Every structure is written in C-alpha cells, then in structure tokens.
Amino acid sequence: MIGSGRKQFSEKLKNAKLDATLRIERIIWIGKFVQKIYQKHGITVEEVEDALLSNPLFRRIGRGHVKGEDLYFSYGRTNAGRYIFIVFVWKHEDAVLIISARDMTARERRYYNEHKKKI
C-alpha cells in the first residue's frame, strides 16, 4: 500500500523522545550525501556542522541496521540563523554519519523554538 511506510515513520517520529545529551566528537561525510544535500536543498557541509554543533535538539528515531548505531534527527540553527533539520546515524565513539539535511518546516521551527526554551 502506498504511503503506509510514511504513516509508520510518522508514528515513530511522534513517539520519539528528545535527547539533549549526545556528545559529537566527529562528523562522517560521504560524498554522495554531501552532493545530494547541496543540490537538493542548497545546504553546505559548513552549515550542517554549524547547526549540529551549536546546541541542537536530538530525537532518536529508531535502531540502525548495526547494533549500537541508531538513527537520529537533529533540529539545529546555524550562527547565521538558518534552521536546519538533519538526519544522521549515531556511530560508535561519539561519531555521526550525516544522511540528509534540509531547511526546517514552519512547524519544525515552532517545535524547535518551544523546546529550546525548556532546556
């Protein structure tokens, strides 16, 4: 059935818990993801790193394919003020593998701003 995967994914997102405790020591980039993020969304590596390292909100979405490597979303803001939504895999030893990034929707910006006030 078309769209059923999206509904299940939306349920996972709704039930995901915020996590402000992740410590990122290293960011892993793969060329095809860098190219896609820039071509499709106009977001640079520097902007993703800025948003990811500037006190973002994290949400664990689910288990990864490898034990101990889970899928996360990040809601962050660059120093220039751009709101960026980032998808990454939490790897071993405080490293993250960036999968995708895009501008936040208006709803995501509201969510981010509301939850940043609480932290």
Where are these regions (language model features)?
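Ribonuclease/tRNase effector modules and their secretory precursors
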Residues: M1-I119
